[in-house]
Amino acid sequence: MDNDYGLIKESVIKADSALQTAVNEKDGIRILNQDFFETLISFIISQNKNIPQIKQCVKNISHRFGDEVIGYNCEAFYVFPDVDRLHEVTEDELRECKVGFRAPYIMNATEAVYSGNVTKEKLDALDIEQARELLMTIKGVGEKVANCVLLFGLGRREAFPVDVWMKRIMESMYFDGKDTKKLEIEAFAVKKFGNLGGYAQQYLFDYARTTLFK
């Protein structure tokens, strides 16, 4: 079912008919299988930054430390450096890429992966709670970032990241507009959506951001 998005949409709506509007309005949403290490660093960078700023930081790191690749129409671009290359980079060099206070977090995450303490293979072997806890041993990785890495970098489709937007829409749709703790929202989502949590989250997030709270 992972690549059958028609079936996924039907299953999400079946899990909760209240999602029908969100699903129907946002056709074409996909969850891509992204590189684990790049996803981890990107979401560490994402804290307190908007999307253009995040993209620029990732581009800065790629341009400075990544390999040049010739792509479509012979245009050159730079790929994100692997863990071996980024492990050679100093904190000052990272700061020059405009990552700010996140530089030591990136250093810590790189060391964790490079040393073998936190690897994709280890995380894949754990249940989602254990994997989340292991990710959160990295400095600067809280529950939201860990859930994003689980969903986008490790293919754990049951992960349900909760940020400000998700908190607002979940409170609006399921908690009568009452202020609700993120942990309570996450627990509700796990019970409600199960292995479809990541897909439900994406539909709800985009619907809230572009339509419901526009």
Where are each of the predicted segments found?
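HhH-family (HhH-GPD) DNA N-glycosylase catalytic core used in base-excision repair
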Residues: 1-214
